[in-house]
Amino acid sequence: MGQLIAKLMRIFGSQEHKVIIVGLDNAGKTTILYQFLTNEVVHTCSTIGSNVEEIVLRKTHFLMWDLGGQEALRSTWDTYYSNAEFVILVIDSTDRNRLLTTREELYKMLAHEALQNASVLIFANKQDVKDSMTTAEISQFLTLSAIKDHPWHIQGCCALTGEGLPAGLQWMQAQATAN
């Protein structure tokens, strides 16, 4: 009976899906969140703690938690994992020096029990910048092909123009309606 009600809610009603947006500092997490919300560039400063906004895409409601990415704040990310259905990992495609740190944080998250059923969307941000890493390069460095227990998708984007962001949201919406 509960499954029937859940299915009817997905078809006819709206169900809220918790999303956490993570990534190292200055990757573009907050810019992406507000690009989703307003379709405009919003001047941001470093997030201390979190920002929360609801994004609606065709009856699918996403409650998005944008978490600060500074080193001192990353240890608090796990307090937001409970009931998260999606993880959006934002990567600065120009920051080759910290990609190892990003990989470590990604696999630490994926190993967390509270995220065992989460789908992962990776935004390779700043694709508009010359010599930025491609999604293929990032995918290879992060060894994304080794991720077997989580549906995942990597999407190149530019947070400032919004390019690539709708495709990522559509992937999330498809994942939400498939479950």
Swiss-Prot record:
Keyword list, A-Z: GTP-binding, Lipoprotein, Myristate, Nucleotide-binding
Lipidation (N-myristoyl glycine): G2
Keyword Transcription tagged: no
Gene3D superfamilies from the UniProt entry: P-loop containing nucleotide triphosphate hydrolases
Xref: InterPro entries: P-loop_NTPase, Small_GTP-bd, Small_GTPase_ARF, Small_GTPase_ARF/SAR
Pfam families: Arf
Record: residues binding GTP: 23-30, 66-70, 125-128
Domain of life where this protein originates: Eukaryota
GO MF term set: GTP binding; GTPase activity
UniProt key word Transmembrane: no
Family membership noted in the UniProt record: Belongs to the small GTPase superfamily. Arf family.
Annotated PANTHER family: ADP RIBOSYLATION FACTOR-RELATED (PTHR11711)
Entry function: Binds and exchanges GTP and GDP.
Designated name of the protein: ADP-ribosylation factor-like protein 5C
Source organism: Mus musculus (Mouse)
